[in-house]
């Protein structure tokens, strides 16, 4: 705090607690809390992270932990204690508890101890997962208060701990900003280093941004905190967000809004599912263009953003700058793994709006899990990073023919070699999540853990087998391009030796001898790299201590203390530049050799948890981070303390023999250290030089000056070893981070190989075929099947053929009974096209597909209660969107358009939609239209590119049998009553419905679309610029006065005709009576 802020803080405490003396720890807690009022503050106290006041009540309720009370102040001049609520969680379980708090929508700030008391034995405990690399410093002088500092702020979009993240999904942080009709969107996954940005413009910008957010499904979204927060076209979710923000103060708007008002409402918004993510409203000043540009230049270590494609995208720059600033703020430092950004455009991939993603059940089934979804079928991956990549491919299919054919070639390679496929998939099981592990290591020892090193080592151990299996095969490289990492590459080029181990993307991996350079030269190289990246000289240039191989010093406290204070790493940091590895997959043999030398076989989970000196106590096995022989200084300190430990271990038998006390015992605990315990019955035999330490009911505990001296040697050695271990670990992280680009390229190549092998496995299991892709608008599927439905059926799935193009078969109008499979056919066609464009084989006997730029679906609907929209309104909104955004290369799937209103209204709208798609010059796209309006089949006579199909059914013994076959021609019946009977409708209702249906069919003439007046305008053929004249049909079906087909709207008879002709105003009472008699007579003889 600044002096002014400190004075204001003190005044606030005096006003809040008049007449109270606050304890020092509580003042410290309130000071930290004041700096982070929007977060739950976890305050480290010994083995627990404690929360106080309102935070404690909230944590106790959410996490179901005990709420207690702790003294925090005393009354001046009185012996009256003041207590506050307190709830704590153990440090070793903090990760799981924090995940629950963040999942509930709260920010969590971690306040860690930064200093230790010299006399405290408990401060050598390991750090938590969130502060693994934080180095404590000893308190000096008379200060008794341990310093604490917030080291991390954890929010839904900034989690980097693997244990808190789903392995198979990315955890995106997104930033969204709109200005003058343009929208900038950036997103990053801090756990993998993925960073990308896009800018939308034009009248479709809002819809495109909404679709991209739906694809990403970010965990957290940053938006500017301002009055015009609403983004046009992103209704209704952003509208509701704006309404909620109006209830908050400006300070509250800057918080991560925790689910109470916003998430509860927006989760009901089915058509904008991204909105259920947590929203953080940031003040508008943080989105300043100049500030954002400077932030990115510094982050990437470059002088211009033109090389990333950002020069002419100001809103993308502002969004990306907000991502980096927010990440730095929450990580409380730099974000080393965001070293490049990928800029892309809306036309790079197939467009899938939120409705299509939901209707086709791409990533989630109806259950909210992957069961019943496309990814549930295709995901045969063996690594978490492969699973994440497959999800990205499914949500962002390609439109580039060359890249698609390369992907199909790769899948074909694995399909045709079962032995290779099995070998690669078995080897991939051993790789794990190398991508996230490498990203944690790149971020340094403050994030990486010893277990991360062990996981990376285990992954690299599998690479030689993978390289050998793949031999000379080269997978497509488009998904592993890291050429944008120019900052790291430029920095590596500055080094005197190839310390950073970065191979530029275009370099040939030529053979070269490993280079070993002196530690001094390596320090100088690192210093210049560090200065270039951060502007700071992080490494000193002191001389290396040339004391390797010297005999261990005598076990004195001075020896141990001196070794710790002057320690410099004496191990040689190797060059991690590539050494002639495979051009396809770098086995990273030199990196593996380095890790094998540096990291012990089974390191503890966290730094500070090693037991270099007390291994064997209570049956504990030796565990250490640094392998013996790697860091001589650690080995010297261990050796220097061995004699002290040996002396202590030999003390018990010596003292028993010298004193004659056979039950004398020498032992240790963390509170009192080493002691000599003597039972009370031998009190008179205790030597005079024994000094009493503790009295027990059964005896006394003592120590001697000599035992105390050796105890200090052991304790100081333990602390020095922890310090040396932390320093050595930081250097190891630093060396590996220098090879970060190389390791990331390897990890992402492995992920790509994993996806190809998985798609091949799915193809073999599902009997899929390779699709043929073309740069036109054909769509020919022979023996097509639904990839998900066929796996859930007990019986054989009935395949179907379909053939479309925009010249002769643009629209397929499908009629047929309920439950006959119309919706399945619609979805399977869309899924087959999508699967082909992610690089997968498809469930068919053969498939020829012209590249689809967008898939639109209008399948099913329900009332949108949250926004007050009826089923029909939802249906019409979605239909309007697809009609406005489709192109001649799109694929439209329409199921039961018009069913949400009256019969004639619905049929009129359905016919008008068909005509618009058929006749509109901008459209003319491939369309599958399923309907129960059988009258629409007559449009085949007047719309030349519309063809009728129906789902076949037959009757056997009075029951309908669905054949699930798509056949040419229109259906003549819907069999709705049969379906009602199958659903369990009572028999009296079924019988009455049958009677009414027969009556309606007998009396009501069939409504048939009538030919429309011939149009005179010229219209190009579908998807072509050439104009031609045509006649379009637009029939106007007969309409009841209320627009609704009625059960009683029958054919008029003589009685009705007579009534219509009567002029009641001109009739006398006698004439009226006579007319009534005539009408009654006509009715009795059946004149209707």
UniProtKB/Swiss-Prot annotation:
InterPro entries: DNA_mismatch_repair_MutS (IPR005748), DNA_mismatch_repair_MutS-lik_N (IPR007695), DNA_mismatch_repair_MutS/MSH (IPR017261), DNA_mismatch_repair_MutS_C (IPR000432), DNA_mismatch_repair_MutS_clamp (IPR007861), DNA_mismatch_repair_MutS_core (IPR007696), DNA_mismatch_repair_MutS_N (IPR016151), DNA_mismatch_repair_MutS_sf (IPR036187). Residues 498-579, 1000-1048 are annotated as: Disordered. GO terms for biological process: mismatch repair. It comes from the Bacteria. SUPFAM superfamilies: DNA repair protein MutS, domain I, DNA repair protein MutS, domain II, DNA repair protein MutS, domain III, P-loop containing nucleoside triphosphate hydrolases. Pfam families: MutS_I (PF01624), MutS_II (PF05188), MutS_III (PF05192), MutS_IV (PF05190), MutS_V (PF00488). Belongs to the DNA mismatch repair MutS family. This is DNA mismatch repair protein MutS.
């Amino acid at each position: 705090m600044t002096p002014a802020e400190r004075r204001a803080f003190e005044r606030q405490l005096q006003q809040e607690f008049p007449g109270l003396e606050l304890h020092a720890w509580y003042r410290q807690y309130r000071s930290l809390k004041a700096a982070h009022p929007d977060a739950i503050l976890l305050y480290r106290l010994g083995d627990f992270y404690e929360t106080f006041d309102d935070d404690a009540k909230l944590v106790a309720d959410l996490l179901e932990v005990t709420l207690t009370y702790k003294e925090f102040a005393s009354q001046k001049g009185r012996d009256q204690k003041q207590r506050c609520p307190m709830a704590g969680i153990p440090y070793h379980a903090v990760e799981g508890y924090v995940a629950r708090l963040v999942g509930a929508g709260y920010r969590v700030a971690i306040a860690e101890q930064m200093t230790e008391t010299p006399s405290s034995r408990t401060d050598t405990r390991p750090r938590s997962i969130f502060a693994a690399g934080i180095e404590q410093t000893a308190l000096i002088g008379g200060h008794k208060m341990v310093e604490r500092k917030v080291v991390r702020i954890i929010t839904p979009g900034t989690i980097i701990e693997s244990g808190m993240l789903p392995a198979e999904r990315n955890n995106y942080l997104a930033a969204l900003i709109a200005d003058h009709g343009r929208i900038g969107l950036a997103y990053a996954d801090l756990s993998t280093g993925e960073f990308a940005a896009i800018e939308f413009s034009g009248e479709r910008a809002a819809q495109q941004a909404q679709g991209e957010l739906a694809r990403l499904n970010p965990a957290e979204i940053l938006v500017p905190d301002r009055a015009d927060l609403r983004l046009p076209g992103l209704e209704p979710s952003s509208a509701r967000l704006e309404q909620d923000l109006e209830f908050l103060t400006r300070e509250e708007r800057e918080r991560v809004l925790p689910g109470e008002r916003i998430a509860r409402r927006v989760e009901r918004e089915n058509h904008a599912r991204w909105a259920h993510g947590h929203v953080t409203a940031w003040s508008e000043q943080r989105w300043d263009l100049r500030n954002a540009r400077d932030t990115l230049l510094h982050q990437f270590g470059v002088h211009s953003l033109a090389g990333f494609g950002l020069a002419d995208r100001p809103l993308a720059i502002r969004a990306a700058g907000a991502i980096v600033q927010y990440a730095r703020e929450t990580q409380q430092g730099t974000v080393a793994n965001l070293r490049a950004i990928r800029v892309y455009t809306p036309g790079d991939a197939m467009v899938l709006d939120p409705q299509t993603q939901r209707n086709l059940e791409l990533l989630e089934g109806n259950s909210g899990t992957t069961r019943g979804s496309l990814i549930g079928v295709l995901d045969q991956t063996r690594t978490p990073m492969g699973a994440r990549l497959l999800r990205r491919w499914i949500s962002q299919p390609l439109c580039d023919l060359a890249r698609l054919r390369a992907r199909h070639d790769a899948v074909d390679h694995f399909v045709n070699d079962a032995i290779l496929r099995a070998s690669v998939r078995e080897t991939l099981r051993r790789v794990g999540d190398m991508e996230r592990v490498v990203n944690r290591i790149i971020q340094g020892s403050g994030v990486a853990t010893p277990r991360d090193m062990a996981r990376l080592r285990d992954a690299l151990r599998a690479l030689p087998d993978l390289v050998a299996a793949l031999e000379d095969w080269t997978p497509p490289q488009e998904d592993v391009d890291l050429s944008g990492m120019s900052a790291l590459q430029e920095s590596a080029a500055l080094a005197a030796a190839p310390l950073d181990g970065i191979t530029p993307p275009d370099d040939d991996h030529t053979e070269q001898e490993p280079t070993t350079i002196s530690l001094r030269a390596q320090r100088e190289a690192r210093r210049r790299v560090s200065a270039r990246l951060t502007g700071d000289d992080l490494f000193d240039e002191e001389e290396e201590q040339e004391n390797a191989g010297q005999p261990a010093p005598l076990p004195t406290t001075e020896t141990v203390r001196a070794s710790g204070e002057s320690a410099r790493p004496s191990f040689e940091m190797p060059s991690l530049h590539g050494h002639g590895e495979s051009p396809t997959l770098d086995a990273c043999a030199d990196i593996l050799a380095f890790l094998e030398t540096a990291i012990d076989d089974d390191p503890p989970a966290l730094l500070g948890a090693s037991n270099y000196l007390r291994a064997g106590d209570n049956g504990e096995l030796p565990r250490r981070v640094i392998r013996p022989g790697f860091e001589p200084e650690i080995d010297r300190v261990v050796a220097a303390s061995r004699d002290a430990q040996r002396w202590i271990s030999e003390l018990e038998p010596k003292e028993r023999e010298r004193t004659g006390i056979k039950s004398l015992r020498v032992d240790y605990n963390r509170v009192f250290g080493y002691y000599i315990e003597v039972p009370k019955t031998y009190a008179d035999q205790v030597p005079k030089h024994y000094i009493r330490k503790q009295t027990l009911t059964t005896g006394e505990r003592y120590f001697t000056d000599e035992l105390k001296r050796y105890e200090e040697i052991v304790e100081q050695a333990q602390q020095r070893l922890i310090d040396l271990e932390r320093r050595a670990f930081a250097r190891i992280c630093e060396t590996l981070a220098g090879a970060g680009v190389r390791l990331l390229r390897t990890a992402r190549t492995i992920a790509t190989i994993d996806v190809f092998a998985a798609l091949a496995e799915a193809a073999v299991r599902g009997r899929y075929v390779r699709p043929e892709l073309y740069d036109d608008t054909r769509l020919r599927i022979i023996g097509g099947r639904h990839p998900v439905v066929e796996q859930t059926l007990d019986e054989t799935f009935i395949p179907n053929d379909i053939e479309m193009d925009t010249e002769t078969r643009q629209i397929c109008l499908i009629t047929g009974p309920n439950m006959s499979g119309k919706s399945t056919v619609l979805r399977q066609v869309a899924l087959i096209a999508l699967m082909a464009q992610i690089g997968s084989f498809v469930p068919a006997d053969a498939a020829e597909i012209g590249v689809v730029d967008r898939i639109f679906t209008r399948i099913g609907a329900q009332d949108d209660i949250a926004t007050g929209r009826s089923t029909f309104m939802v249906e019409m909104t979605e239909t309007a969107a697809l009609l406005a955004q489709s192109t001649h290369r799109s694929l439209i799937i329409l199921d039961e358009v018009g069913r949400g209103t009256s019969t004639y209204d619905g049929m009129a709208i359905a016919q008008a939609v068909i005509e618009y798609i058929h006749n509109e010059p901008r459209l003319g796209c491939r369309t599958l239209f399923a309907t129960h309006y059988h009258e629409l089949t007559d449009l085949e006579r007047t719309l030349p590119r519309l063809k009728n199909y129906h789902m076949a059914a037959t009757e056997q013994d009075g029951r309908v049998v669905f054949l699930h076959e798509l056949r040419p021609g229109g259906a003549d019946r819907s069999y709705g009553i049969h379906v009602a009977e199958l659903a369990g409708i009572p028999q009296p209702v079924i019988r009455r419905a049958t009677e009414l249906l027969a009556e309606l069919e007998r009396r009501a003439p069939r409504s048939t679309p009538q030919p429309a007046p011939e149009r005179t305008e010229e219209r190009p053929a579908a998807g072509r610029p050439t104009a031609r004249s045509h006649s379009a049909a637009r029939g106007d079906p007969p309409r009841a006065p209320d627009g609704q087909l009625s059960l009683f709207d029958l054919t008029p008879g003589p009685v009705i005709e007579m009534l219509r002709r009567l002029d009641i105003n001109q009739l006398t009472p006698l004439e009226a009576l006579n007319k009534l008699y005539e009408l009654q007579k006509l009715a009795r003889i059946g004149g209707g």
